[in-house]
Amino acid sequence: MHQFKYHKGTLHCEEVNLQTLAQDYGTPLYVYSSQTLRNNYKRLHEALGDLDHHIAFAVKANSNLSVLRLLADLGSGFDIVSGGELFRVIKAGGDPKRCSFAGVGKTTEEIRYALEQGIYCFNIESLAELEFINNVAGSISELAPVAVRINPNVDAQTHKYISTGKAENKFGIDYEETMQVYERASALPHIQIKGIQMHIGSQLTTVSPFVEAVKRVIPLVKELQQTYGIEFFSIGGGIGIVYEEALASGPSNWWSEQE
């Protein structure tokens, strides 16, 4: 449950009158509920129960320092796609050792910075990127921890422009080529194999695509555990918001009554 409620016809966030905030600070104005963020994090953490799990917030979703600081205090890790995002996480008190560096456009400077800060893992998108990261790590005598992002060829049942897990999508290594990439990674002197990652899309409003993708990848995960001792399987993708149902909920005159 979120903490945005109407009280005597005026919208409040927790106990704060949003009309007063708008008058004091002007509009447009972004207001975040710390209690909602805490509750949602707690619900996800508790839903995973006794499983050995790690929650990583995607900084690209919201890089506000106060939001990042709150999540860091809760123990969250972070998914980053740039050196700038890593800088913001560190500034907010986040632990680089709980950060995974994703994305296809990592620069030499960003890779060096991430290695110097001791990030947990790079998610690599191609064999060429694997070789590139190995070379950068070697130039500063470091060992780069990596996970290969695979494409499981699963339909995320989301908008075609934010689907990333089908064979025709541009992201990740083809499922059938995965073991070849890990074999190459194991031979590179400045690469440390950490795990495996998939990301099938954003704005998913049903868990069935996750289930299908996990079932498809699990045999590969087991083989990688036996062969290379991987530490984790990252299940990427964003749980979505059902906007239409949210707007349609309640009696038809609800909106007019709030004016």
PLM-predicted stretches and their roles:
Residues 64-67, 85-87, 108-110, 152-168, ...:
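Conserved radical SAM core fold
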Residues 58, 145-151, 197-199, 234-236:
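Short beta-strand segments
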Residues 23-30, 116-121, 160-173, 206-210, ...:
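Glycine-rich tight-turn/loop motif centered on a GG-T
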Residues 184-209:
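Gly/Ser/Thr-enriched, mixed-charge loops and adjacent short helices
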Residues 34, 38, 108, 127, ...:
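Non-membrane alpha-helical structural segments and their capping/turn regions in soluble enzymes
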Residues 1-144, 183, 187-192, 223-228:
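A charged N-terminal "starter" segment
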Residues 205-259:
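C-terminal active-site-proximal or functional interface alpha/beta core segments in diverse enzymes
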Residues 115, 129, 136, 168-186, ...:
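Metal-dependent enolase-superfamily TIM-barrel catalytic cores that perform enediolate-based chemistry
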